[in-house]
Amino acid sequence: MGKAKFERNKPHCNIGTIGHVDHGKTTLTAAITKTLHDRLGTGEAVAFDKIDKAPEERERGITISTSHVEYESKARHYAHVDCPGHADYVKNMITGAAQMDGAILVVAATDGVMAQTKEHILLSRQVGVPYIVVFMNKCDMVDDPELLELVEMEIRELLSEYEFPGDDTPIIQGSALRALEDPNSQWGDKILELFDAVDTWIPDPQRATDKPFLMPIEDVFSITGRGTVATGRVERGVLHVSEEVEIVGVKEETRKVVVTGIEMFRKLLDEAQAGDNIGALLRGVQRTDIERGQVLCKPGTIKCYKKFTAQVYVLTKDEGGRHTPFFNNYRPQFYFRTTDVTGVCNLPEGVEMCMPGDNIEMNIELIHPIAMEQGLGFAIREGGRTVGSGKVATIIG
């Protein structure tokens, strides 16, 4: 039995469920797969206990339990991430490689907004989850319509507080458990309503090839008589021969160069696109002018900075991290894309130390600039071993 071919006949979108523990994230995930399967005939129904017993994954040495399910709405194919534990969520959002295109925030109508509801919205803002749709769960257990209205108002205020459009965000009232029991009921209708909202509120993600060209430089060598070649994997966009690119990072000033040749697997290409491992021949560049850790990019699309705030997860001892806390002015290496840069951590006011297993927002200043933008991931390393993982939240300069 060969593997089924992945049919790319609908746009693809990465989403996940977020929200307070026991508000019904996993039940909703199961209800979505069952309802879409039973009502639209797409995908496969995945049982609650199969999602709940999420396998442990090790991503860059960090242990995270996550469940991945896929399903299809009328308009799109979705890959959906659900995590059983709160710590897993935080780790997944800060360290996970898969960027979410949007999230479904689950809030139990019986409890309203809770501590982790706030934390997940804040994290979404910090790590660059661009869109949130809300599912108010357990509405079958609330008899008072005024109470439902109050919870909805509370959610809208909270979203606005974290700079999401609270007034306009779709909020669907339903019951995941009732929909799971009978997808053809009015509660099943609510799941379809949720997906009409998700399909429209979360726009089609921009494909990597449509974004401006960027390639982190992994290696540099010179070919006598031809010039200097920079090699690496194209992160996004498309590059054509004889286009101008900019070399950004490490040095304060950037410079523009023309790409006179593109090579892949020893063959010459006219163009390279996201995902390709290439060598780019650069006109008039000395071997000493360019180094690993810089990026080639479409001119003017990315700048380099030294100072930024970041959302960071500090590995536990069991994950191979530190055994002891670190303090203000801690100076580790920050590994961005292809290179380590030394930097200084400034902890938030009133925070004296950071323990293994903590997640924390901190200010970081690097000793030399790196091409960066919000949401860029990095590892924190000490002597070559990873002790933390983070994402750029805001750029200071």
Swiss-Prot record:
Monomer. Belongs to the TRAFAC class translation factor GTPase superfamily. Classic translation factor GTPase family. EF-Tu/EF-1A subfamily. Residues 10-206 form the tr-type G domain. GO terms for molecular function: GTP binding; GTPase activity; translation elongation factor activity. Coiled coil: none annotated. GTP hydrolase that promotes the GTP-dependent binding of aminoacyl-tRNA to the A-site of ribosomes during protein biosynthesis. It is an enzyme of class 3 (hydrolase). Keywords: Cytoplasm, Elongation factor, GTP-binding, Hydrolase, Magnesium, Metal-binding, Nucleotide-binding, Protein biosynthesis. GTP binds at residues 19-26, 82-86, 137-140. Residues 82-85 are annotated as: G3. Residues 137-140 are annotated as: G4. Residues 61-65 are annotated as: G2. Mg(2+) binds at T26. GO terms for cellular component: cytosol. It holds the Pfam family GTP_EFTU_D2. The keyword Repeat does not apply. It is found in: Cytoplasm. It comes from the Bacteria. Residues 175-177 are annotated as: G5. Residues 19-26 are annotated as: G1. The gene is tuf. HAMAP family: EF_Tu_B. Its EC number is 3.6.5.3. This is Elongation factor Tu. It catalyses: GTP + H2O = GDP + phosphate + H(+). Gene3D superfamilies: P-loop containing nucleotide triphosphate hydrolases, Translation factors.
